[in-house]
From Swiss-Prot:
Entry-annotated residues carrying Phosphoserine: S52, S328, S394, S443, S635, S639, S1043, S1205
Annotated Polar residues bias: 254-266, 354-385, 458-467, 547-561, 590-601, 661-674, 1060-1075, 1191-1212
Protein's name according to its UniProt entry: Activating molecule in BECN1-regulated autophagy protein 1
Ranges spanned by the short sequence motif TQT motif 2, renumbered to the chain: 1116-1118
Region named Interaction with DDB1: 1-22
Organism: Homo sapiens (Human)
Pathway the protein contributes to: Protein modification; protein ubiquitination
Motif PxP motif 1, residue range(s) on this chain: 275-281
Amino acid sequence: MKVVPEKNAVRILWGRERGARAMGAQRLLQELVEDKTRWMKWEGKRVELPDSPRSTFLLAFSPDRTLLASTHVNHNIYITEVKTGKCVHSLIGHRRTPWCVTFHPTISGLIASGCLDGEVRIWDLHGGSESWFTDSNNAIASLAFHPTAQLLLIATANEIHFWDWSRREPFAVVKTASEMERVRLVRFDPLGHYLLTAIVNPSNQQGDDEPEIPIDGTELSHYRQRALLQSQPVRRTPLLHNFLHMLSSRSSGIQVGEQSTVQDSATPSPPPPPPQPSTERPRTSAYIRLRQRVSYPTAECCQHLGILCLCSRCSGTRVPSLLPHQDSVPPASARATTPSFSFVQTEPFHPPEQASSTQQDQGLLNRPSAFSTVQSSTAGNTLRNLSLGPTRRSLGGPLSSHPSRYHREIAPGLTGSEWTRTVLSLNSRSEAESMPPPRTSASSVSLLSVLRQQEGGSQASVYTSATEGRGFPASGLATESDGGNGSSQNNSGSIRHELQCDLRRFFLEYDRLQELDQSLSGEAPQTQQAQEMLNNNIESERPGPSHQPTPHSSENNSNLSRGHLNRCRACHNLLTFNNDTLRWERTTPNYSSGEASSSWQVPSSFESVPSSGSQLPPLERTEGQTPSSSRLELSSSASPQEERTVGVAFNQETGHWERIYTQSSRSGTVSQEALHQDMPEESSEEDSLRRRLLESSLISLSRYDGAGSREHPIYPDPARLSPAAYYAQRMIQYLSRRDSIRQRSMRYQQNRLRSSTSSSSSDNQGPSVEGTDLEFEDFEDNGDRSRHRAPRNARMSAPSLGRFVPRRFLLPEYLPYAGIFHERGQPGLATHSSVNRVLAGAVIGDGQSAVASNIANTTYRLQWWDFTKFDLPEISNASVNVLVQNCKIYNDASCDISADGQLLAAFIPSSQRGFPDEGILAVYSLAPHNLGEMLYTKRFGPNAISVSLSPMGRYVMVGLASRRILLHPSTEHMVAQVFRLQQAHGGETSMRRVFNVLYPMPADQRRHVSINSARWLPEPGLGLAYGTNKGDLVICRPEALNSGVEYYWDQLNETVFTVHSNSRSSERPGTSRATWRTDRDMGLMNAIGLQPRNPATSVTSQGTQTLALQLQNAETQTEREVPEPGTAASGPGEGEGSEYGASGEDALSRIQRLMAEGGMTAVVQREQSTTMASMGGFGNNIIVSHRIHRSSQTGTEPGAAHTSSPQPSTSRGLLPEAGQLAERGLSPRTASWDQPGTPGREPTQPTLPSSSPVPIPVSLPSAEGPTLHCELTNNNHLLDGGSSRGDAAGPRGEPRNR
């Protein structure tokens, strides 16, 4: 093989004729074709469709590159031949608009489409089709064929279905952590090795019918802690809330009788377990009696809520499904590789009479779960992994023989799939490694094994619901020695109180059952350990480089010595509703044992108490807090003080149902009114609200990438912050410290009040409160400086992808800045979001849903999953395999993968906030060596909705949505732009525009045309195709070489703040200065405070000399000879008129061409100067020019001799003034000009000759200066050039007084 030394097409073709085959020759020729066709003239041709649809949505190409499929608003799909442009097939059958369409990459003639009513159809162009409907008729958002397998991925709502179309329905489903996290896009790479998913980021989402709940002070600290853990916040209105409210309207109580099954794993259902030992039968019967005692009939099916349905119809088909036993426990050395076992199920459930017929082989018992227990850094939105077996730890003794029993006893207490985090894990970690990186499971469920499983059994779907734990605070099974008749609630008249009493009764009954189990078992130490597991899901951390494992000790149980006692994170605030004050108030529980501090030191051992009646009291922990004492003593039930569960209350501030505890002591408890009578609440709320707003602003101001840094994203490096962000950070720290002092003062007063009312318990109450009841603010403020070290590989990790961080390059234009306001007037996120919502509503009211979706605050995360082994993606985990954290997606055309699978193009929100926000087209690398690295960027407005990479991956096309009504008649309209990827990591210069795609528009059409999808034709140099909102399907092909287009685009692509000098003659014919503005154009210019350019000449105030205006732009600056003063004075009228006649026509033709492309032109005339700003249709081609007029006396002044230097030097002398204005915070337009008749100033005339135009530099990323609000986007790009004349010297050559 001979390597081609150079890119010489003639030699390559000559060698190919002689039979020589050079390596890479084919690719070089294809690249050459792409480079040459960009200079050719492109002609668009409409495809004649059968019934003239109103809109065209998506395009897809067949694998043989001969057919083009398009979806339309008339519910049909049309198949067009690419070469001839003729429609050859019409696929009719959808009841609503098909929203997505795709060809099978390898099977010819196979098309899949999904419509808005939840129907998926697979069409065979040779005849026939298969269809499947979603259960809830949710719209189909995206479809993806696997290139080699008979597999179709269906994205709908928050689920991804896996369908083999030879079956009647999908065989597996994975779900996100909540219904708010909708799946918007699924895409395989060209080889099918990796899967790309786009899922809504839940942090800025709300339901359609869910009101916005502000974050108050009690939740703000936990919001900050979740940000530290790099996990998404818990949704504040859990599904269980709706479920309990639905049950509260009934006269009956809570139905908890049936076996609760959690759709939590992706593994097939295991067979029923073997017969239980005789020691377990009494417990089972006791539990059955309890279940019958508290069970009530329900009449309504609630399966649509995503919760376990308890109605008779659904529960009749349910069978208890138990955890598999594990006969042997791995040694301590094998903890890191021991997979966890999860409770699994399939739907629909097998009836009891069919259980024996559906038994599988015993090998499935040991199948690991799809996703193992995830560490604390991602615990906020991970699986509720009900792992009661050995999860990466060894449990010595007979404990390993009872996981099924404990699971069976817990499961009926779970209220459907929303029992939150029953066994949430928080791993022990040293102080230096307090934030472990997220990880996926060591072994995932294989789709092939699922298929084999179902071939031998039923056709049931494997539903893997990783719904984030919300609702019930599953803080474990609190044990009590008392009957539990005390209550801290006085709201007996409310429905919540009745519901709470029912729940309290259930918990008390359940606690009695636990005491019965303990007395029957007689295994006190093992019971304690299992109880701790049920409460905390203690998981030993994999030893890190600086974290040595604790030596194994039989009496200390090293498997427990490195764990934490972790309460449910949803149970961090214990608030009760006080009817007297009509507010939720904090209860400060006291605990009989245990110490805690603000450090992250882990306990070294647990000491088992050999008392047969001992129980583990619940140790309340705030979120993320860990006890640091070396020994945690297990107190017996005979201790003087003990907690009691008195019920469950709904916390309106945090949106959680939370268990309420009270203290059982000899002297009784203190009432809520007495505890809170002296506590100031208003100032705390004000501080919390102020701190919340500051934190929200700081997050947006800093734009700090926490994944690539070892610092907390809330507290970034001050050197990288703007002044406004730095001020917000300091205020947050100050308010946090003040809140900590207030909390300590409140606790001191509470302790003093308790000691005065309960003298018997005062001896041991003080240390317990000071140690255990540590508030979160104390903990965070004291420890955040040592804990904010997130590992560099915390962003992306998977077994096959390796652990790395995609490199993010903070280019100068993407660094944080204070926004479009001055820093003291910087709006917060709430104001900014509100304005964007208003803009989005206005745009969508005009039918522009694509632009509205980009303006809205919705963002998506792109995750990259390894699919080589057909493992189900863990889409419930929002922090693993994240390729792009935030991007904008409108439809399947908003994201594209190159044909070679090496590049990914997507739209991401800009760090610079505006109204509306800008967007950035970002091209990322998918290569293994730099996966996730941002290579190319380009700024765009919110009307960029479609992106397509060329077949060779060297060009990118951006499709545009319409923004406004046409202001003038036009025969062509720009609908897309094509850019060349030329310099990686070059910022705005990394892409270079090469040409625009123009849509031929009828003369009577007054509206802009939007593109819904634009795609390159699959062969290099063939052309492109796009579909519009008018129903057109247009195929553009390069027809003929355009000789002047190369030179034209070279000139047009130069930066606007560079002065160009060339020898082109300005004597160029053009259009006349006839009036061509429409009435709407004139009205719009007046509305925004600008004077439209009139054909009449302006008269200066120095005389009656009529001046003709001369307009030139900064891009095509022409150098002219400076006329002599005498010549200029003798004939100013004729000379200026002739010059303006030629040069003005050239500028006018340029303005008309820009406006034909959808741009806008503003002209401002003053007494002595004229400023013109022309903005292209997309806002990234801005021309600003300034002209200073000369009166008849100018030429004879002595100062005119000093201005006879060549024009470029004059321009350079004038350039710094605009920068000085910007530094002072003044816009060039608002700078004070010398007006005639101004008191205290002598009106002086400028000394520049009429032939010396002044170009004005324009800084595109800047937001200073006046903005032309004539368009919806890019209004903060334009700087007026009116400041250029400020350097004009007076008659004595001195700078003029400003």
